[in-house]
Each structure stands twice: as C-alpha cells, then as structure tokens.
Amino acid sequence: MASTPLLGSRTLDRQTARTLPPGSRLPTLAQTVLFASHRKTFFPRMRERYGDVFTIRLVPSSRVVVVLSRPEHIREVFGSSPSVMHAGEGNTVLEPIMGSHSLLLLDDEDHVRMRRQLMPAFSGQALRGYAEMVHELARAEVANWPIGKPFKLHQRMRDLTLEVILQVVFGVTDRDRLNQLRPLLDKIVSVSPVIMLGGFYPSLLRVPPWRTYLTLQRQVDEILYDEIARRRGNLAGRNDVLSRLLAAGNWSDVELRDQLVTLLLAGHETTATAMGWAFHELARRPEELAFGQRAADAGADDELEAIVKEAMRLHPVVYQVGRRLTETADVAGYRLPRGTTIMAAIGLVHRDAEHFPTPQDFRPQRFLEDDPPAPGTWIPFGGGARRCIGAGFSLMEGTEILRAALATYNFQAPNPTPEPAKPKNVTLVPARGAEVAVTHR
C-alpha cells in the first residue's frame, strides 16, 4: 500500500483527496482566519453547504482537518483507541507554558498513568470537600458587587475563578503569598496566543515578548516550587488539590508544577466564561432567573447545575476539540489517512434542533426532564479517555457560584440585546463582558 501524507503535508495525492469529505476551496490562509475569528458562523455555513462531515485546511502547511457534527460520529471518535486518536500531539504548542508533563500534552501510556494519578483529587468525596471552600469564596466575591450600577460580570468571574485556583487547587492561604501570586498568575492566564508560537519556533524565546514571558514564568515557577516543598512537609489537615495529589501519589516537583499550571490555564478562563454566559442569560430571562433563585433558596443542586449545563450548551466556551490519526482509519464513512486532524464540532452539536428542541432558547429544564439529552449530544468537556478531568470540579464550582449569587441578588440586563461571542485565545467570551446590574432581593 502506498504511504499516505502526514499532517504537515502541503499537498495530498489524488487518491487521498478522494477519501476526504467535501470542503471549501478557499485559500488555506482564508480558512484559517475564518476558523480563528468567526468559527461560530464559519462552521454552520460549512455544514449547510457540505453536510454533516466536511473538510477544512488550516495553517501551518495546509493541514487537513475533518470536522464532525453528528453525535454518532463523535461518539465513534471518542470511543476509539487513544493510540489511534492522539490528542496530546495537537497541544505541543502549549509545552513552553504548561510543561512537558502536562496531562494535555501526553498520549498513550503516559497519559493513562498521569490521568490515573490525578483522578482521585477530582471525584467523589474530594469534590464534596471542595464545595464549601468554593461557596465561601463565592459569597465573599458577590458581597462586593456594586448595587444598581451596570458592571462587567465576566471580569468578576475571572477574579473569582482565579481565587478558587489559588486557594482550592493550589492551597495557598497565606495573605502575603496570595498577594504575591495574584498579579503574576493574572498575567499568566492572560497570555497572548502569540506567545504560543514559541512552541513552533524556539528561537523566538530569546527575544521580547517571549523573553519577558519566560521571566514571568520563572517568577511563578519559583513560588510554586517553594509551595510544593513546604507542602511536602506539612500535609496535616489540608483539603486542597495539591495536598491531595501529594498525599496520594509519587510525584516529582516538575510533574506537580506542570499539572498545577495546566489546571490554572485549563480551568480558569473556561469556568469564568461559562458563568459569565449563565448570568448573561439569567439577567435577560425573568422566568429562568426566578427558577434559579428558587433552586438557590431550596438547595436544589440538580436545578442549579442544570443552569450551568444549559449555559455550556448554548454558549460552548470551547467550540471544538481535536484528535490526530496515528494510522489510517475509518471515520464517519470515510477512509481517512494517517496524520489527518479530526475535530468534533461541539458548537454545531449543541445547537442541533434534532437533539435540542428550540436550540436557541435558554431552557435549563431540558436537563431535568424524563428524556434528557442523549449521550454524545452535550459535550462541553469532550469525551472518551480524554474527557476533561476537571469536569466535575467545574460543574461544582458553577453550582456554588450560582447558589451564592442567586440567593443574594436580582439581576437585570442593562442592554437587552444578546451579547455576541468573540474569540479570546481558544475560548468564546461575551463581547460586552456579560454586563449586568444587580439589586438585593
């Protein structure tokens, strides 16, 4: 059998081209710009024109990407062997920031081993132990919101989720250490995508702004390594994620550092944005706001969680997730060559009327009905062996934030026009910052 081109190939032979789904003939650079800046309109137009499975090409090197929008096809990918569908390779651009031991960068046995070590800190009893800590931080945050004056709630959520990372994940409670870390970590989580080019072109790391970023990263690493060393000698009575990891596994300092930075970058902006969208919708919908307030008063966690889930459905923070084929494979009825990137289009699935009646409506009750959404139709955390390890933590965090805010305030939208989404790195955030106004209940 003739060899097939790899991911970085500029051209495909005619036989390979015939195995690919149909797709746009726009120049690769044009497709890349549309994907990066307008994916919420680019993907729906592509599906409308070419069907549920289509091909796009992205820089660098005109790489081939096959996009899936049917749940059965996406389940097929998520359920495939991780050795055939690699996810870590596609994240190598993140290595200068997250580190080579990051769970997001690992594949095969390395990924299985690291995930097994991390899982106990993100499930069951551990999550229940974090909930009270998150709730107290949320109560302290909402108590400082301005009354009767419009403000951008997305930034408040960013501040709060950073505090959760600092105190609940890192376990930092010393006031001086918190004051030292906050401004540094805020710069880390606000990193420009340009910095990630250092993963492709290491020579860039010797010049600004990459050199400036490395200096910042060294400052953060120095504090994190010091915190890890202190914690190794004092785990008694600790209930944070770092302490649980130290107590349960045999970790090197570098492995721990890489996981902490990964949790910071993967869990900060995503949860903050999801909650910004949730409050944006509640402020514009009095009936759903009243539903949430009743749930907060009654301690109805399932109903509060349903609000978080519906916000993640209607406004997926990450619009797509990818895999890279390590060998030729049959996917969605096509024989795809080794090196092909496969994208599961979360945003297309979440707004498909076949799976979510009236998909444009914000209706949390759909997650509480006797016939809830079918498996593979609600996938904000991905799926299969690569499903986000922090999914349970994120839902718990969102539930506690809603509980604190909805028990305290009424919400209004100063501008009733729905906010569009705008790309920010890999996420889609409210363009006007999720502007709301609150009054005491």
Model-derived features: positions:
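Cytochrome P450 proximal C-terminal region
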Residues: 1-7, 16, 47-48, 138, ...
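Conserved cytochrome P450 K-helix E-x-x-R motif and the immediately C-terminal K′/meander segment
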Residues: 32-51, 226, 298-332, 353
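N-terminal membrane-proximal hinge/A-helix region immediately C-terminal to the signal-anchor transmembrane segment
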Residues: 2-100, 104, 113, 128, ...
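Cytochrome P450 fold signature focused on the C-terminal beta-domain
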Residues: 235-239, 291-301, 314-334, 349, ...
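Cytochrome P450 heme-thiolate monooxygenase catalytic core
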Residues: 2-18, 86-94, 106, 110, ...
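Cytochrome P450 catalytic-core helices
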Residues: 270-295, 391-409
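Conserved cytochrome P450 K-helix/beta-meander segment immediately N-terminal to the heme-binding cysteine loop
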Residues: 344-371
